Amino acid sequence: KDLIKSLPFKLTDSQNKVLSEIFSDLTNPNQVMNRLLQGDVGSGKTIIAILSCYLAHLNNSLSVLIAPTEILAQQHYQNFEKILVSLNVPLFLLTGSKKIDLKKIPKNAIIISTHAIIYQKAHLDNKISLLIIDEQHKFGVKQRSFLNSSTKLPHCLTMTATPIPRTISLTILGN
């Protein structure tokens, strides 16, 4: 709540409702979240992702946001950094050109990545508690199936600005 109060803008009623639902899912030990967050470009999906990852951080859990391109991953990283910089949240960027040693990541970190993390996922298997996928339909079939191959399924939030039937069916059916 302190982070929300410190934001330089007020969340909309819709954002507050979505956050309440996501926070309820993330704190319910009897359920694994699998949600689709659809909104136009600029509608505030990123702040929902930031606040959701921050809740995971506060609960000493690892969260990962995966973006389809390096440019989008860098934009997300910069947005997360702006909001979280004063809170000493361990924040990492992993792309094809920016490597990190996943074995040394604190368990309460936030990782922003491209599909590059998929190929190093073995180091994180069963450690990710929240997985946020931005524009899932832009990932290939092999990449999506690899993301879902953990023995312990994390909470999953899929964000999209493209309400196409394929995205909706992928989220509902999980394949």
What is each stretch, according to the model?
Residues 62-72:
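Conserved RecA-like ASCE P-loop NTPase motor core of nucleic-acid helicases/translocases
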Residues 74, 125-130, 136-175:
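Post-DEXD/H (motif II) to motif III coupling segment of the RecA-like Helicase ATP-binding lobe
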